[in-house]
Amino acid sequence: MNSISELQKKIRNASQLRITSSADDTDDQLLNMSSYSGVVEYFPEELVITLKAGTSIKEARVVLEKNSQAFSFYVNDSEKTIGSIFATSGSELSDSVLGIQIINGKGDLLNFGGQVMKNVAGYDVSRLLVGSLGKLAVITQISFKVLPEQVVNRLDLKEVKSRTESPIKSEIDKKLKSVFDPYGVFI
């Protein structure tokens, strides 16, 4: 799948196509997004990058590092794709998502969110779909806010609770806990 129109056609013509994650045990036809990769747009001065779902973390990091920037969430396996990280993550990643492009079950191409930090367009579908395992729609593109590398490097990644938890969220949680619960009463 190298184009949106190919993906839309495949979804429209599918009878046994079921959107699944690689963790599902099924005989249904899987939709492999790995060939649909690359940077759609990158605005280093705005701290925003839009990536196709099949783009590997490694490939995205190479682009970001050229401008001394990094994702604000932690990913242990750099071979995973942006789409798979999006589909299997939780709220840690959703804090970084600005917008998405999806194909719904009818084959319609839909855009949600945008490329700005503040979005007041109603329901935040882009964040709702984080962790949905790709079962609600085919995620084709994702826009992320990124941070300067020096900000991310100052965070203590050893304290990150899960593979995909945001180091920034972890650091903020740790500091808030020290202020609001200095004696460790609440677990």
Give the ranges of each region predicted by the language model.
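A short glycine-/small-residue-rich loop at the edge of a beta-strand within enzyme catalytic domains
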Residues: 51, 116, 167
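Conserved glycine-rich FAD pyrophosphate-binding loop
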Residues: 15-16, 32-36, 61, 68-80, ...
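Short conserved micro-motifs on helix faces and helix-strand junctions that flank
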Residues: 51, 131, 178-179
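FAD-binding subdomain of flavoenzyme oxidoreductases
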Residues: 57, 66-158, 186
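Glycine-rich N-terminal segment of FAD-binding domains in flavoprotein oxidoreductases
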Residues: 1-73
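Short, surface-exposed beta-edge/turn micro-motifs
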Residues: 28, 46, 97, 135, ...
